[in-house]
A protein has these predicted regions:
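N-terminal beta-alpha lobe that positions the nucleotide/phosphoryl donor
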Residues: 1-207
Length: 207
């Protein structure tokens, strides 16, 4: 903010009245004659409704098209699509029924340890590692609250937890002129609270 040419206060208090207020962000963009909006990280960065609102306002959303975000911004929707395409996926539950009873039955079927994940957003919010069934109910309550506060949605998915797995990413960047570049793999396995702390490239276990 200190390095920005212009800074606008979009609100104080809960994020629902500031960083999650789509209309307010677009209004500020128009007031400052901005041509594009970069969503940043977390909050609305993976919200397809925000990307669509930016597009409809005649501004450029720096990121994927709203249709792509709608597909990939929801872990439950994207995982269903991958399973339909027969892409190998971690065993889990990504159904519409979000009742405690259904999630409990699904958790027992998946087995422990397992991860509770917010279907929307990322950044480690709305995630809980559950090692035994007795801890599941409280973990679901906490994860739902975190997800709702951070992303505006309390929808959750469950996945089998692989404790000693590596987190490897490959990033692709494209522009509006059909140019595409990819970066070498990054090892993001060193984490704190399910959030990357260090990214190593190239990965020491792959190169």
């Amino acid at each position: 903010v200190a390095l920005a040419d212009e800074a606008i206060n979009i609100g104080l208090g809960p994020v629902n009245a500031s960083y999650l207020d789509i209309n307010k962000i677009i209004d500020v963009a128009k007031q400052t004659n901005a041509q594009s909006i970069h969503p940043g990280y977390g909050f609305l960065s993976e919200n397809s409704n925000f990307a669509k609102a930016v597009e409809l306002a005649g501004l450029t959303f720096i990121g994927p098209k709203s249709e792509a975000i709608a597909l990939m911004g929801s872990k439950s929707v994207s995982k269903k699509k991958m399973l339909e395409a027969k892409v190998p996926c971690i065993p889990g539950y990504q159904g519409d029924d979000q009742s405690d009873n259904t999630l409990l039955k699904s958790a027992k079927k998946i087995g422990f340890p397992l991860m509770i994940k917010a279907s929307a957003g990322g950044g480690g919010r709305g995630m809980r590692l559950v090692n035994q069934v007795d801890d599941l109910k409280d973990a679901l309550k906490i994860a739902r609250a975190e997800a709702l506060n951070a992303f505006g949605s309390s929808e959750l998915i469950l996945e089998k937890a692989f404790i000693n797995a590596r987190h490897i990413e490959i990033q692709i960047i494209s522009d509006a002129y059909g140019s595409h570049l990819y970066f070498g793999e990054r090892d993001c396995s060193i984490q704190r609270r399910h959030q990357k702390v260090i990214e190593e490239s190239p990965s020491p276990v792959m190169t």
